[in-house]
Curated annotation (Swiss-Prot):
Disulphide bridges: none
Binding site for a divalent metal cation: H68, H146, H210
GO MF: metal ion binding
Domain of life according to the entry: Bacteria
PANTHER family: HIGH-AFFINITY ZINC UPTAKE SYSTEM PROTEIN ZNUA, HIGH-AFFINITY ZINC UPTAKE SYSTEM PROTEIN ZNUA-RELATED
Species, as recorded: Treponema pallidum (strain Nichols)
Keywords: Metal-binding, Periplasm, Signal, Transport
Function noted in UniProt: Part of an ATP-binding cassette (ABC) transport system involved in metal import. Binds a metal with high affinity and specificity and delivers it to the membrane permease for translocation into the cytoplasm.
UniProt name for this protein: Putative metal-binding protein TP_0034
Pfam families in the cross-refs: ZnuA (PF01297)
High-level lineage: Bacteria, Pseudomonadati, Spirochaetota, Spirochaetia, Spirochaetales
Cross-referenced PROSITE patterns: PROKAR_LIPOPROTEIN
Amino acid sequence: MQRCSVVAALAGVVFLAQACSLSTPSRITHTDKLPVVVTFNALKELTQMVGGEKIHLVSIVPDGVDSHDFEPKAKHMAFISDAKVIVYNGLGMEPWIHSVLHAARNSGSIRVEAAQGIVPLKAHTRGHTAHHVHAHASHGSAYDPHVWLSVCNAQTMLRTIGKALCKADPQHTRFYKRNARNAAARLEALYKEYRSKFAALSHRYFVTTHAAFGYLCRDFDLQQKSIKDVFNTEEPSIKRLVELVEFSKKHSVRTIFSERGPSEKVARVLAQEIGASVETIYTMEKNEENLSYYERMKHNINRIYRACSKQVTPSQ
């Protein structure tokens, strides 16, 4: 994406938003519920857990569009201008967000960086050129943005979102606090269940197409081997594929994890080479098979555990 295109378009977008403000049926001001805008699916799910029926929730990044590459249109600016609470991930996941927030001129809104309070992991930039790495770093992407894929981080995010909703809508404070507490407790139970299961394994590594699961690895002391790095932007080199084939054969890897989409093709090539199967893993950046956040998180953890439990000690 050409980053300057977002900035260049903002003036026109704001003009269009103002011009359409009286006629656009998708404005969210005319509701008794608290108007909340989030950037993408995982944040929508987490915010809905807390807000329930008390909020009117809009997610602005469409399914199938990468949050990094999203370019806001007039209707998105209108939503942001109307919102009382705006939830975004941070850590460079939405490099356009601060320009958009400034252009929206909604100074009365509560703006929530969901990654706040989470210790970030540095992004591994294997295979990137110095120019490419610098470009990511200049947009705040020196760190891995995929904080929502951690069952522990998600609990922090729920509390952060809950505090914002309570501040924006104090009359429903008890409702938001209870929902945040219950959702976090459910995730904590999932964490405790699999923490003991993973601890009993001798081998805790898995192979995936996209290095998006560093925070989940931190939860359970796992190690991910990936075809592409955290930015998921460059095609893997032959050298990298050979390394993964050798690693997978040495450690009896029988599962290659992949998001649905173009990544599945290279995953199948690697799986065929080592005699493994390909299993779906969810990144939760978009709606995936109409599964909830909790269902996808449990799926990911369970499938990784099953894959790790099949591994054997490599022969010397």
